Amino acid sequence: MSKLQIIQSKGQYINGEWIKGNGLILESTNPASGTLLWQGNNATDEEITHACYIAHCALKSWANTSFEERARYTIAFVEQVEKNRDQLARLISLETGKPLWESQTEVSSVIGKVNLSIQAYQERTWPKQTETAEANACLRFKPHGVVVVLGAFNFPAHLSNGHIVPALLAGNTVLYKPSEHTPAVAELIIQCWHNSGLPPGVINCLQGNANCGNTLLSQDIQGVYFTGSYATGLRIHQQFCNRPEVILALEMGGNNPLVIDEVKDINAAVYHTMLSTMITAGQRCTCARRIIIPDSQTGDLFLERFAKACKLMRIGSFDSQPEPFIGPVINHVQALKHLHAQKQLIEIGGEIILPMSLLVEYTGLISPGIIDMTRAKNPPDEEIFAPFAQIYRYNHFDEAIQLANQTRYGLSAGLLSDNKDHYLQFYQHIRAGLINWNRPTTGAASSLPFGGVGCSGNHRPSAYFAADYCAYPVASMEQPLLTTPAQRLPGLVLE
């Protein structure tokens, strides 16, 4: 990539304006080539503090705006995304390495999120009124105030959008810090908000690394909406242990199980397992990390075909022809980290079936890997965010469920089975927020809640239930005329 093709940052977006940043240099690279893609600056402490002040200044007017008008701004945002659909999809692919077909799907999710969020708000946080003998019992909802959205790199447009849109609909103002790996995508999304006519200060974007995030979280804020690793989510939780008034919505991934039963259609099982483990180069929080297979001829045949499918899978840059199924992981550093994790599993007794390896130096391009952990000693309960599957064998279905539940996480779990009774048993005993039957573990719908239990979250599911953490309920007993009740309580004397 030549110097001329590097995207120069617009700056920090504060109070409806792009302001040239004064912080340390921040850069993002194309993970498929390792070349520089975008260059800008980390937000300074002063810029972050100023943005928070601006968000508070904009809050009263925005919160007092009618829901219908706030919804119109989100619809105008969608129209801007539609106009920039191709540019946004290409930028997602350039900055994350995703194949173009997957980036186009992400853009469609961004567009579809708005109407679903409007519907969810009207269903879950709409005012209600009940007449009683003494007064009107009213339920209404108010915004929390200024909320922080911390973006993730794997879906740089869609996941942040899933917090931002419900927050704005509820009347909050937003401080948005994208992932430091995907600042270019964030700038285009914010430009779409700007072009929608959204009032200044309602959304502000601050680019930066983890230090910027820490500074942002120390501000006068009323909510934090986060998608990312358990380690980071735990630090956020600990940071707010003395600030219980700040609402936290934490989505933190999982060590997700996929159980293969004695199925008839082995190829179907392989297909859904590929989509569960390898899609997005294994960088979805719902990806299956542990594949639990029967210790039988069916299990052997499944594993043989699964390994073959992984070998034949096309991997490459988003613009490669023929089109790849997956691209790279987010950068070279993460690729090396995943290879080190594979080495550690081998050292505790894991048996390599298909080694994960670096395909191109100084990039995030790695081949898919499969390791049999059945005889390993004390395997770590960690999420390896890569195209990497760990195999565990079982002798009876009860054992499969027991193995599936051997995790502190609880985001997604799946069963591939022709036996409905087995699914009912699986559903009854599995501890997870998303439980799928004969579908990939990565299959989710924005019309449903999205979140996990255990170390996967803090019981604040997003997607359709995001409205719940973007506003708080206010209960009121109301009577338009001040009167003395006909029957007074004993012991009270009035003149």
Swiss-Prot record:
The active site is at E251, C285. Its EC number is 1.2.1.71. It catalyses: N-succinyl-L-glutamate 5-semialdehyde + NAD(+) + H2O = N-succinyl-L-glutamate + NADH + 2 H(+). GO terms for molecular function: succinylglutamate-semialdehyde dehydrogenase activity. Keywords: Arginine metabolism, NAD, Oxidoreductase. GO terms for biological process: arginine catabolic process to glutamate; arginine catabolic process to succinate. Pathway: Amino-acid degradation; L-arginine degradation via AST pathway; L-glutamate and succinate from L-arginine: step 4/5. InterPro entries: Ald_DH/histidinol_DH (IPR016161), Ald_DH_C (IPR016163), Ald_DH_CS_GLU (IPR029510), Ald_DH_N (IPR016162), Aldehyde_DH_dom (IPR015590), SuccinylGlu_semiald_DH_AstD (IPR017649). CDD domains: ALDH_SGSD_AstD. The keyword Nucleotide-binding does not apply. It is an enzyme of class 1 (oxidoreductase). NAD(+) binds at G228, S229, Y230, A231, T232, G233. Belongs to the aldehyde dehydrogenase family. AstD subfamily. PANTHER family: ALDEHYDE DEHYDROGENASE-RELATED (PTHR11699). HAMAP family: Aldedh_AstD. Catalyzes the NAD-dependent reduction of succinylglutamate semialdehyde into succinylglutamate. This is N-succinylglutamate 5-semialdehyde dehydrogenase. The gene is astD.
